[in-house]
Amino acid sequence: MMKKLTMFLCLACAWMCSLQAQEAKTFFKNMPDSLSPLLTAVNRADFIDFLESKMKAEVTNRFGGKSEMTELASDYIRIQMTPQSSWQMKLLATSDSTKVICTVSTACAPACDSDVHFYTTGWEELPSSSFLTPPVMKDFLSLPDTVMDYEVRDAGEKADMLLVKADLSAKDNTLTFTFTTTDYMDKEAAEKLKPYLRRPVVYVWKEGRYELQATSNE
């Protein structure tokens, strides 16, 4: 009887360890320094320790500034790297039961713009096109060719660079892109475009890639 109990406890422990090894925090700790130039390995470990101890997870980064991990879940991490930049990570299951890591790096100066990347759990970069078809200008700005207002058309021409802020969700497997091009434009031109702006573009993770969920003209 004792042998069976011991074997059961060993198997349960191994199962729990296996689950923990698949959590975002484990992959985050093992992230190569080359992909985390602002944070040291000690910084990354301290983030986890602080949050798990119910403490504010703020560290002094490699360049002497303050960085704070603001969210930690089994499959999600968010860090405020600097006052103007943030980093997010999401652990996503693929159709063949393996997992990939999605990261979003956002910088605001002052308009926010994000870069989305995908990696294996060993932090080898994967082609983004295999997992996401990114949104384009027309997904956010619906400016009909029939618009005759010169000021509106002029404002549309000033929106010549697509800037978007991407956000991974801690609660589900969605990825949301918000149009930020108007944040770098002059206020008057941005106001002219407001009636033609669509809602944020939302993608949902399905069968190993992000699929467009909804866009709206509202």
Listing of model-derived features with the role each one plays in the protein:
Residues 66-78, 120-129, 207-209:
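Surface-exposed loop/turn elements that mediate protein-protein interactions on large endomembrane-trafficking
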Residues 1-27:
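Bacterial Sec-dependent N-terminal signal peptides
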Residues 96-106, 172-178:
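Acidic/hydrophobic-patterned starts of short beta strands in beta-sheet-rich repeat architectures
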Residues 129-205, 214-218:
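Short aromatic loop motif centered on NTY/YTY
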Residues 22-93:
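Terminal domain-start segments
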Residues 100-135:
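Mid-length scaffold segments of soluble, non-membrane domains
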Residues 79-80, 106-112, 189-194:
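Short consensus segments that form the blades of beta-propeller domains
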